Amino acid sequence: MPAIRCRQIAESDVPGITGLLARGFPSRGAQFWENALAQLAARQPPAGLPQYGYLLESDGRPVGAILLICAQVHTGDTSVRRCNLSSWYVEPAFRSYAALLISRSLGHKDVTFLNISPAPHTWPIIEAQGFSRYSYGVFVAMPALGGLFGTSGVTVLDARMPPTVAFDPREQDILAQHADLGCISLWCVTPERTYPFVFRPRRVKKLLPCAQLIYCRDVGDFVRFAGPIGRRLLRHRMPFVVVDANAPIPGLIGLYRRGSMPRYFKGPQQPRLGDLAYTEYAVLGV
């Protein structure tokens, strides 16, 4: 067998990686991966972190790849470099080298790594790599049924509408950038201040339209404004919202599914629930 090399994906590798991932994930097709890699090309990762991710190369062609979506994110007064590991695939004949991709990816220091869509059979592998589960399930909410009588004075605005009360400019950037990625970005406006929300349109089992909560300041804010937000999302024909959760969420009508869509992290800062900003769900649309 020819020598195996593991290195960063370069721009010249994009056509080969597109074909590799289209073969590895045939349900998505080449056009999806062309778009995904174009999104990564358009981003500016933090200094020292890869633009696309890493590949395994044999005899001059890619035989494995993992994408890294890297961002500098702010949580309160702190800032952290975060990388979402995504779309890990290695051709069957080279599976014994698959760990090289992970070890190279995890070699960056002072970075919090996320794995937010692992297949169930990989959970023990992920945990052996030092990842910890921080979200154990999801709550599927019907927010339009909530807050029918307790949310007067709240206005829901498209993020492109400038708020007239206090807001955080960094959150405005998050909403604008995610709207450009195809997400639904909203402000909930009270007389005192604004509250940011980002949702990704999805389909449950490829059939039922819903919205996935990508970003909010606190899940409690979503509970507080569930009614107005839910009624706004009904305009998009999305009656359900999927929220990361470790237990049923008081104040929301819906169903908690423990063990569904668990999230893992490794690094200096555990992500909070309600923050999937700049991850594969938003950037790639997986």
Model-based region annotation:
Residues G76-V140, L207-P262:
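Acyl-donor binding region in acyl/amide transferases
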Residues G259-V286:
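C-terminal functional modules
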Residues A47-Y52, R61-R95:
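A broadly used, surface-exposed interaction patch
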Residues L145-L148, S152-C216:
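A conserved mid-domain beta-alpha-beta active-site/ligand-binding segment of alpha/beta enzyme cores
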Residues L55, R61-C70, E192-R202:
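Conserved beta-strand in the GNAT
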Residues M1-A41, N84, G137-A176, L284-V286:
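Short amphipathic alpha-helix that is part of the acyltransferase structural core
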Residues L40-L55, L175-W187, H236-R237:
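A short helix-loop-beta-strand connector motif used in the catalytic cores of GNAT acetyltransferases and
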Residues G48-L49, Y54-L56, I69, P120-P124, ...:
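Core nucleotidyl-transferase/polymerase catalytic module
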